[in-house]
C-alpha cells in the first residue's frame, strides 16, 4: 500500500436516494482527509460519463489491436508501430475479464457512446471518400483544440504527474 495513492486524485461518490446525508458526508470526509478531490454524481451520470471517457476508449483500443491483427500483414504492421500506436493501444493490455464485466454491466451507456463514435468516424470517412481536405482538417483541428484546452484545465487527469 502507498500512503499517497489517492492524494490529488479524483474520487466520485454515487449515492443512492436511500443514502443518508450523514453517511454521504462521512464518506466525503474520509476521502477528503486522505487528499482526494471528492465529487458526487448520480449512478446514472457516473455510468454515462465513464462510458464516454473510459469504457468506449478501452473498447476502441481493443478493437484497434484486433483489427490490426486480423489482417494478414498485421504482425508486420505491429513491428513498424511507433509511439502513437503504443500510446493509443496501451489500455488494450488491460485485464480481459475485468473489462468484459465493466462493458457488460454498463452495456446501455457503452452502446450509446458507440453510436456517437460511429457518427464521428463516419464524418472522417466521408471527408476521405470525398477528398475533402478542408473538412478533414476541420475535424482534426476541432479535436485538437478540445484536447489542448482540456490539458490546460486545472484539476484534470492530464495535469497529474502520471496518467495511470
Each model region followed by its residue ranges:
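Rossmann-fold dinucleotide-binding core
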Residues: 1-38, 47-50
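SAM-dependent methyltransferases
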Residues: 133-164
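Substrate/ligand-engaging "lid" and interaction regions
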Residues: 38, 49-87
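Interdomain hinge/lid region at the active-site interface
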Residues: 74-143
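Charged/polar positions within long, soluble alpha-helices
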Residues: 61, 65, 93, 122, ...
